Amino acid sequence: MKITTSGRLTILLGRQQAATGERRSLRHLAHLANVPKDFVYRLDAGEARYVDLDALARLCEALDCRLDDILVWDNHGRQPI
């Protein structure tokens, strides 16, 4: 099983912009969630090796989303047990 985050934050920011009309950048998201901008950029690029769960919770709060909106599980076609 693989977990990916590639592009998820950008997609969620786009959805938020469509709903509210307010344009936000990854840098602004990092500021709102009080997390390092480098973490946000690495997470969106799918390059984060370790993930701070508190930081993820703050990102979810800032984006008004759930954890599985950011983290995508790929089972490679296998069914869960």
Predicted regions and their residues:
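Residue-level detection of the helix-turn-helix DNA-binding "recognition helix"
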Residues: 14, 45, 75
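Short alpha-helical DNA-recognition segment
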Residues: 20-43
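A short, Lys/Arg-rich alpha-helix, primarily the initiator
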Residues: 1-28
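Short, basic-rich loop-to-helix N-cap that marks the start of a DNA-contacting helix
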Residues: 23, 47-58
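DNA major-groove recognition helix of helix-turn-helix/homeodomain DNA-binding modules
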Residues: 54-69
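Short, charged recognition helix plus adjacent turn
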Residues: 71-81
